[in-house]
Amino acid sequence: MAIAKEDILEAVSSMSVLELNELVKAFEEKFGVSAAAVAVAGPAGGGAAAAAEEQTEFTVNLTEVGANKVSVIKAVRELTGLGLKEAKDLVDGAPKPVKESVPKAAAEEAKKKLEEAGAKAEIK
């Protein structure tokens, strides 16, 4: 007696997640396969270099405070929304990241504001 596809689908749809997990493991053992997703082949040749060039998130690091510490603290507060004490601690602890995981335009704007305040900053 053959089992119809509809019967199998009905049985699977009524299973709990735990039962489905056990079913998948049984299929893996019985047929010697893996339920892992198939990896898609990337572009040949310079694919890794192109991926490295297209960085989308950047970190702005405060490297040096400079002579006008008060202006730098104000700039840090404006950029981060930190309170006065937190901004002062960040500036005193330089070199430290000021903004992390931001788009390139936002990183460049933050660097510009810090440099206008008299600090030295870098984008990574």
UniProtKB/Swiss-Prot annotation:
<dbReference type="InterPro" id="IPR000206">
    <property type="entry name" value="Ribosomal_bL12"/>
</dbReference>
<keyword id="KW-0689">Ribosomal protein</keyword>
<comment type="subunit">
    <text>Homodimer. Part of the ribosomal stalk of the 50S ribosomal subunit. Forms a multimeric L10(L12)X complex, where L10 forms an elongated spine to which 2 to 4 L12 dimers bind in a sequential fashion. Binds GTP-bound translation factors.</text>
</comment>
<comment type="function">
    <text>Forms part of the ribosomal stalk which helps the ribosome interact with GTP-bound translation factors. Is thus essential for accurate translation.</text>
</comment>
<protein>
    <recommendedName>
        <fullName>Large ribosomal subunit protein bL12</fullName>
    </recommendedName>
</protein>
<keyword id="KW-0687">Ribonucleoprotein</keyword>
<dbReference type="InterPro" id="IPR014719">
    <property type="entry name" value="Ribosomal_bL12_C/ClpS-like"/>
</dbReference>
<dbReference type="GO" id="GO:0006412">
    <property type="term" value="P:translation"/>
</dbReference>
<dbReference type="GO" id="GO:0022625">
    <property type="term" value="C:cytosolic large ribosomal subunit"/>
</dbReference>
<feature type="region of interest" description="Disordered">
    <location>
        <begin position="94"/>
        <end position="124"/>
    </location>
</feature>
<dbReference type="InterPro" id="IPR013823">
    <property type="entry name" value="Ribosomal_bL12_C"/>
</dbReference>
<dbReference type="GO" id="GO:0003735">
    <property type="term" value="F:structural constituent of ribosome"/>
</dbReference>
<dbReference type="Pfam" id="PF00542">
    <property type="entry name" value="Ribosomal_L12"/>
</dbReference>
<dbReference type="Pfam" id="PF16320">
    <property type="entry name" value="Ribosomal_L12_N"/>
</dbReference>
<dbReference type="InterPro" id="IPR036235">
    <property type="entry name" value="Ribosomal_bL12_oligo_N_sf"/>
</dbReference>
<dbReference type="InterPro" id="IPR008932">
    <property type="entry name" value="Ribosomal_bL12_oligo"/>
</dbReference>
<dbReference type="GO" id="GO:0003729">
    <property type="term" value="F:mRNA binding"/>
</dbReference>
<comment type="similarity">
    <text>Belongs to the bacterial ribosomal protein bL12 family.</text>
</comment>
